[in-house]
């Protein structure tokens, strides 16, 4: 049988092969730029500081008319099936082939839409000040930067053009590892971040939220050794799908905080790139006037690789006049930092010159026309697209690729010039997370419909049945075996990190985000019923649908694993093996054959701890767990085994303690569920083959315990968030183990809560 010959990759056509009308359309795609030409009489000046925040917002009629006309066209999309609409606009996007081509053609690191957009900005404007080239040093700050595409794009630009300067950068983003941050507001892709964490600043509370004054103050300290800052970028936004017509107003406070941060940190002559949306609102007019008074040049630019139908634009500000020029106003702006700034207008109407308003209206009209044309054209093609139009679109997309490459003269970059040459670590968000996040609710419409349903409706419609079904056939722990070595405990780099006390655990790098979100909803909406699930579901029913590992079966598994563990001479252990069993006195009556010698470490509180929205983030639980662990470690000798109950392992703190166990035992696995009671501790860690814990590590954990004791008071505003470097928790097999452990625990809780809800519903119907 002959092998099928692989066809050569299709080579993009030269620009000369495209028709004049196609070339004209594509060149227009790359010409969406507007410049604020300033009057020669220097009329555009900042008003007296006393004028700022002196009155409420009052919209401009002409701009409001533009906003309303745009929203009228957007409203025509409300009856479209959004997943179909997204597929359609992906095809009609004239720049749709550029990203994949660039990735292959120039070997771009983290090549995303943002990478290409920033490359366009870099190649279209002199963002890097001459002072950076003269000094041989470039310093940049990147706000709301995750996953890091602007940084990767800038690296490619500098390295491929061989610019003669040493580059240092600092980045910010909502911290994807902070348990109180909401997944909906974050970019959870950490491919670059996990490998460059020393360059990311998440603030004194470790959340990464730039909309607090504490963050701004902390950032200034963090940047103190990196002066001057030549370039600041701010690419912030958040999900406005629930109210797309008000996107501009919803993100205005974020844009304000980004702009203030830039004006405070940027050096004289520096550049600032700010992502905004439509510029119709009073708050946007004020911000644009502020930027025009603070920089020599301001341009509004829509990259070709920014989807033409959306409102996104980039405000490119060149040659900063310096803090001295804006200092009096800046001081007042800092006092209004955060979400509160939306209450009062930065400037009243009368201080903004008519010449600026006219120019600004021109700008808004310019981009309004392009966006309106694109949406209208997409609607027309959605209703009917013939073969000829499809061919023309394909021609336009091919032409756009060539136009992009020719206009910006991108050059290849070898991998050894990438920021992350070889990724050794990566959060589960990038391995299991991305494979699972859309597994259960595939279409946008389904996800939006889920938001409108009550918890009871979701249960009744069987939305979570797949998890329950997986749980009943799943045998957790059997294939999750962690093999450890003491050499992994490189405690010299360990450091306690404190932060704002967690109100609840909303996200975790060690668990499927959709499962955690659903479990939280179940606890929140169904807590009263959930606590009495055992009264509604008989033990026989629970055992049939959800097998429980008894103490005997857990110890039998422990014995089996112990026999697999060779002693120092390579044979099975011949003498008795001490088994430290942490838990309730009820297990004292268990009769186990040799070689296990059971010793009880009594801790009723640990086994009876109830699950809440804090999960294992509750400082009281963490203190109790660490106390039991330290007490147990004092009694262990080489070769001993231990059974340790665990509530869950969603937090960095508990993941750190699991990492320690991983380092001082030959093997670790788990059993779940081990309890019939809902929302109680239902899993145990089986730790086999103790290998001695270094005294320095034990002392470190003792110090953590002592600090925990001091922070245990309910009124304490802070808690310990982590004590191991995040890099240590993001590598090896630990991530997979924690993912499996947390999935088993969460699905068990969900299963019993859902079972209780169903039985209650059936009982109500019978009545």
Swiss-Prot record:
Ranges that cross the membrane: none
Active site as annotated: 117, 235, 275 (proton acceptor)
Residues holding S-adenosyl-L-methionine: 148, 167, 235
Catalytic activity: a 5'-end (N(7)-methyl 5'-triphosphoguanosine)-(2'-O-methyl-ribonucleoside)-(ribonucleotide) in mRNA + S-adenosyl-L-methionine = a 5'-end (N(7)-methyl 5'-triphosphoguanosine)-(2'-O-methyl-ribonucleoside)-(2'-O-methyl-ribonucleotide) in mRNA + S-adenosyl-L-homocysteine + H(+)
Keywords, comma-separated and alphabetical: Cytoplasm, Methyltransferase, mRNA capping, mRNA processing, Nucleus, S-adenosyl-L-methionine, Transferase
A GO biological-process term: methylation
Adrift-type SAM-dependent 2'-O-MTase domain span: 109-322
Compartments it resides in: Nucleus; Cytoplasm
Main localization category: nucleus
GO terms for MF: mRNA (nucleoside-2'-O-)-methyltransferase activity
Assigned EC number: 2.1.1.296
Signal peptide residue numbers: none
InterPro entries named among the record's database cross-references: Adrift-typ_MeTrfase (IPR025807), mRNA_Cap_2O-Ribose_MeTrfase (IPR050851), RNA_MeTrfase_FtsJ_dom (IPR002877), SAM-dependent_MTases_sf (IPR029063)
One GO cellular component term: cytoplasm
Domain of life: Eukaryota
PANTHER family: CAP-SPECIFIC MRNA (NUCLEOSIDE-2'-O-)-METHYLTRANSFERASE 1-RELATED, CAP-SPECIFIC MRNA (NUCLEOSIDE-2'-O-)-METHYLTRANSFERASE 2
Free-text function comment from the UniProt entry: S-adenosyl-L-methionine-dependent methyltransferase that mediates mRNA cap2 2'-O-ribose methylation to the 5'-cap structure of mRNAs. Methylates the ribose of the second nucleotide of a m(7)GpppG-capped mRNA and small nuclear RNA (snRNA) (cap0) to produce m(7)GpppRmpNm (cap2). Recognizes a guanosine cap on RNA independently of its N(7) methylation status. Display cap2 methylation on both cap0 and cap1. Displays a preference for cap1 RNAs.
Name of the molecule in the record: Cap-specific mRNA (nucleoside-2'-O-)-methyltransferase 2
UniProt organism field: Mus musculus (Mouse)
Lineage: Eukaryota, Metazoa, Chordata, Craniata, Vertebrata
């Amino acid at each position: 049988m002959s092998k099928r010959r692989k066809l050569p990759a299709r080579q993009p056509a030269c620009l000369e092969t495209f028709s004049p009308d196609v070339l004209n359309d594509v060149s227009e795609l790359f010409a969406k730029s507007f410049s604020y030409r300033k009057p020669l009489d220097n009329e555009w000046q900042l008003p007296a500081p006393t004028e700022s925040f002196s009155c409420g917002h009052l919209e401009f009629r002409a701009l409001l008319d533009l906003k309303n006309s745009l929203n009228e066209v957007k409203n025509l999309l409300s009856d479209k099936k959004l997943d179909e609409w997204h597929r359609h606009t992906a095809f009609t996007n004239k720049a749709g082939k550029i990203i994949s081509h660039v990735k292959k053609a120039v070997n771009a690191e983290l090549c995303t839409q943002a990478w290409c957009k920033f490359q366009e900005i870099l190649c279209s404007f002199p963002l890097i000040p001459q002072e950076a080239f003269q000094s041989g040093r470039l310093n940049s700050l990147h706000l709301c930067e995750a996953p890091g595409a602007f940084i990767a794009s800038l690296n490619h630009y500098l390295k491929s053009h061989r610019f003669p300067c040493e580059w240092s950068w600092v980045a910010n983003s909502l911290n994807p590892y902070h348990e109180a941050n909401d997944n909906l507001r974050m970019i959870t892709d950490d491919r670059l971040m996990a490998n460059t964490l020393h360059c990311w600043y998440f603030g004194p509370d470790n959340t990464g939220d730039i909309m607090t004054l504490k963050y701004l103050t902390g950032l200034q300290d963090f940047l103190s050794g990196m002066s001057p800052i030549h370039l600041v970028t701010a690419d912030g936004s958040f999900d406005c799908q629930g109210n797309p017509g008000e996107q501009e107003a919803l993100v205005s406070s974020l844009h304000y905080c980004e702009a203030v941060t830039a004006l405070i940190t940027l050096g004289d002559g520096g550049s600032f790139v700010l992502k905004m949306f439509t510029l119709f609102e009073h708050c946007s007019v004020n911000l644009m006037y502020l930027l025009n008074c603070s920089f020599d040049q301001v341009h509004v630019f829509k990259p070709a690789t920014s989807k033409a139908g959306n409102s996104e634009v980039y405000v490119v500000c060149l040659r900063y006049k310096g803090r001295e020029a804006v200092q009096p106003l800046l001081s007042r702006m800092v006092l209004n930092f955060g979400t509160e700034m939306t209450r009062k207008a930065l400037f009243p109407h009368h201080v903004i010159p008519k010449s600026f308003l006219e120019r600004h209206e021109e700008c808004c009209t310019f981009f309004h026309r392009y966006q309106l044309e694109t949406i209208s054209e997409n609607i027309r093609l959605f209703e009917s697209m013939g073969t000829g139009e499809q061919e023309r679109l394909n021609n336009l997309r091919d032409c756009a690729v060539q136009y992009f490459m020719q206009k910006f003269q991108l050059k290849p970059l070898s991998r050894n010039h990438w920021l992350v040459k070889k990724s050794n670590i990566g959060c589960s968000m990038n391995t299991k997370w991305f494979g699972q996040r859309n597994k259960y609710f595939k279409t946008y419409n389904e996800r939006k419909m889920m938001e409108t349903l009550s918890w009871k409706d979701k249960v009744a419609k069987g939305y979570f049945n797949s998890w329950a079904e997986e749980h009943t056939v799943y045998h957790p722990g059997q294939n999750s075996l962690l093999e450890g070595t003491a050499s992994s405990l490189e405690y010299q780099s360990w450091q306690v990190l404190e932060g704002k006390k967690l109100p609840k655990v909303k996200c975790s790098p060690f668990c499927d985000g959709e499962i955690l979100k659903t479990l939280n909803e179940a606890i929140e909406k169904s807590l009263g019923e959930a606590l009495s699930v055992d009264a509604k579901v008989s033990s026989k029913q629970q055992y049939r649908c959800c097998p429980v590992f008894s103490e005997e079966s857990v110890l039998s598994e422990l014995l089996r694993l112990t026999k697999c563990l060779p002693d120092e001479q390579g044979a099975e252990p011949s003498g008795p093996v001490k088994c430290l069993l942490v838990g309730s006195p009820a297990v004292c009556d268990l009769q186990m054959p040799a070689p296990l010698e059971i010793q009880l470490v009594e801790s009723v509180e640990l086994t009876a701890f109830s699950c809440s929205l804090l999960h294992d983030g509750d400082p009281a639980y963490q203190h109790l767990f660490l106390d039991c662990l330290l007490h147990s470690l004092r009694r262990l000798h080489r070769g001993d085994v231990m059974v340790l109950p665990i509530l869950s392992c969603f937090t960095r703190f508990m993941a750190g303690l699991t990492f320690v166990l991983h380092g001082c035992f030959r093997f670790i696995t788990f059993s779940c569920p081990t309890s019939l009671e809902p929302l109680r501790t239902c899993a145990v860690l089986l730790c086999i083959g103790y290998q001695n814990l270094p005294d320095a590590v034990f002392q470190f954990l003792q110090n953590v315990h002592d600090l925990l004791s001091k922070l245990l008071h309910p009124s304490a505003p802070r808690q310990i968030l982590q004590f191991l470097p995040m890099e240590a928790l993001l590598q090896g097999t630990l991530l997979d183990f924690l993912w499996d452990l947390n999935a088993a625990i969460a699905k068990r809780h969900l299963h019993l809560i859902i079972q209780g809800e169903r039985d209650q519903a059936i009982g109500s119907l019978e009545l």
